[in-house]
Amino acid sequence: MWTSLAEFTCREPIRRGSQAIAPDGSDFDTPRLRGRLIRGATSGTWSRRPSRVAYDWDLFAEEAALECLLFESHGILDAPWALWLPGPPSVSGIHNLLVHLRFRRPPERWFSHLPADWQSAAALRYIRATARGFGMRVPLPEPTAFEEAESVARWLASARDRAGRAVLKAFASSATRVAEAARQLRIDLRGCLIFAGGESLTPARIAHIRATGATVFARYVATETGWIASACPFGDSPDAMHVFTDRLAVLTAPADSAVDDDAPLLFTTLSAGAGKILLNTDLGDSGRLRRRPCGCPMGHAGLNLQLSGVHSQAKLSIEGITVAVAVITRALDRVVAAAGGPPDSYQLRQEEDGAGARRLVVRLGPALTGVDDGALLRGFFAELPRHGPDAKLAARFWRESSAIAVRRGSPTLSDAHKMRPLTVSGPDHSPRFDVARGRLR
């Protein structure tokens, strides 16, 4: 018994034998949470109608207990810490804030890639006023553009000088930008710890961040499940994480589905606080699982299932924002068609530089010779927000960060002479894998 990504996102009916069920996105909702505290949009959904996920204080209480274990494992319970995560309407920043309010450890600073809209600002003022009544100071999100990573690096160094340790939670690409700013300004980040999530913590990113003196560890969170796993200081690698098996079960799909020894991960929710009810459900991520005893507080609590090498199968993660490949290609198809180009006249390529920073390249084929590169890119950023809240957020992020470029070149074909919708390359631009029909090959 399992639920595929296509079934969970309602792209395909659930077929078992002669039975077929055409689910709606809300069919997977936890009934007791309907209409509860806050809602977030699922990340990288393949469905045309984005699925919404509800959260309440029961979920935050569960996650707060796990966050306490994580901070205790690293010896940072009393260390000053900050967020560099987007504020509302994005759910990532407010989710982390509310979890930490649950155990009375709000961040000292909240750097946000985007300014809050008026509705979100009103909600944040209410949260601040309520927290103040309990003796807690909650910072407002400070708009901090990608090119202003220097501000975050300087805060880390200053907080470290003041308290001996300093902690930052950020997307992996944002953490890389902080490290690059520190490198250019010769800011020593020894004694600083960064929890990086939202994207794969690749070896290049790890090396680039460590070169500043900082330490970095992976975190794994999904909108549908909440907290999934976090890394302690004693793992095999910074991306080797303890799975929070008290609130969900994880196993891998059959071996014949694996790619490069990494199999799709299947999740089953065990907690009544989870926003979605999952039963061996594929969320589109792959990774490696193994049992490993550990002497850290999380290990002593019985969390001895280790997850490493997590990466997205059918989704793109650029600058911490994850969007389905199908959403990007649907938007580009419309823009290319409007410019008079035929189908398959472009190709997507994800590149990673030596510092671990990722960007998306739209490679235009010979059929689009007369199309202006800048006009096509502007058309893409205008079209993408029409494809759901995740796509709208991605358009804002990627435009501001210059994370997308246009180049010229003929598309590459697979060994079977099929068009590769997406190719992925490493720091030397050598190909690693391609995604065809929404699957890794």
Model regions: which residues?
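AMP-binding/adenylate-forming catalytic core of the ANL superfamily
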Residues: 168, 266, 274-399, 417
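Conserved AMP-binding/adenylate-forming
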Residues: 192, 196-294
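Adenylate-forming
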Residues: 175-190, 208-210
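Nucleotide 5′-phosphate-binding alpha/beta core
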Residues: 1-162, 166-169, 183-184, 188-189, ...
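Alpha-helix N-cap/helix-start capping motif
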Residues: 172-173, 199
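Flexible loop/turn segments at secondary-structure boundaries
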Residues: 88-92, 175-178, 202-204, 225-226, ...
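Short amphipathic beta-strand and strand-loop transition segments with alternating hydrophobic
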Residues: 251-254, 345-353, 405-409
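Short, well-structured beta-strand/strand-turn elements
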Residues: 3-6, 215-223, 339-340
